[in-house]
Amino acid sequence: MKKYLYAALVVFCFNVNITAEEVTMESDGTIMEFNYLTVTDPQSFMMALDKFDKSKCAEKWRSESDVGVSLWSLRGSGSSHFILVVYENAEKMEKGRAIFNSCSESAFMIKSFQKNTDTDRSWNWVAENVVAASQWTTDTVFAKYNFKVEEGHEGHYLNSWKKMMSANLDNVNGSFGMNRVLFGNRYSSHMVYVGNESL
């Protein structure tokens, strides 16, 4: 009997699709770019973003790659903002980046950042979703933590994170999840987030 209880515990602890109170935790497959900026001239910066957003290039980029783009302000960071670019999967990202990189409008927008951001403090990295619960795109505020997991220990950390969040579902009204850094960030290998519709 003891052997069967232990086997059931192992299966429960390592199940990737834990469901608790109708909250499923699994990867949503998304690939995202985090583009960190320190804005020095907010008006000029927003005008550059708006100009690009109204361009034929941006329209083609969105329609052909289904990209989702949003601007976020930061607190407790060396950067003032980040532009989050989200694709459904790696294939959509490849298509989207090819379109974005081929347009003069995107080049002009990026060039304008020399005048309205501190480019010495700009950086970006790419991540993929490992696990997500609830729909994060409806949330407007997030607590986000970047950290480094020792190589080979992602599964242990992921299971611990899911176990902790499952035990705290009554305290979490919004989304939560974990992303794996693919490249661009030597300081962090992962990030976890907890979102909500308001503070």
Feature roles, as predicted:
Residues 4-14:
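Sec-dependent N-terminal signal peptides
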Residues 19-199:
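Short S/T/G/P-rich N-terminal loop/turn motif that feeds into the first structured element of a domain
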